[in-house]
Amino acid sequence: MVLATQKGDTGATEQLQLAEGHPRIPQCGVSYAVGVDGIALSLIVMAAILTPICLLAAWNDVSEEGYSREKRYFALMLVLEAFMVGVFAATDVFLFYVFFEAMLIPVYFLIGLFGGPRRQYAAVKFLLFSLAGGLIMLVSVIAVYFAGPGGSDGFLIENLTGNLDASPEALRWMFVGFFIAFAVKAPMWPVHTWLPDAHTEAPTAGSVI
């Protein structure tokens, strides 16, 4: 299905393709709004290709541990893929934040249930670092909303682009909040210390994703 959408002309227009939007919490400006452009579609295709490759690569290892664990593993990987697609397709800043943070849940269980001997320590460390970055990002997300035009669709990226009423200093602090959250996930120095434990203890497919 993802590859079929490539037939659409996603690169010849500034308009998003396959766009869909529904108000969810209009009092707070939150909408379910998704759509793709050329970049988003490329990332979605990459996620759609990598996930089955990771599942096939881990098939024998997980199958040896029993059918119930196999079901949990494949379910977690598919949930993670769904959240990744949501991150790439979201056109509402708050919805993007929800998908971005929701990815922590399947990754935490992938490490904690299917990792190496120190998997619990690695999973908790990854979770704490990511939650700390996510909370800082949430502050920036809320600040962006109040600096924007507001309204029932105040979190839509198209409404926020070029319409933030804030001082240069405030905008810099908003950027810092997003940067810290992305730096944790990247990961970048000095917030990278969760990486050696997580990638060492995580199952191979989890590390790839």
How should these model regions be labeled?
Residues 1-2:
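N-terminal signal-anchor transmembrane alpha helix
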Residues 81-82, 123, 159, 179, ...:
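Short, hydrophobic/aromatic alpha-helical segments in well-folded domains
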Residues 5-31, 135-197:
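Juxtamembrane/interfacial segments at transmembrane-helix boundaries in multi-pass membrane proteins
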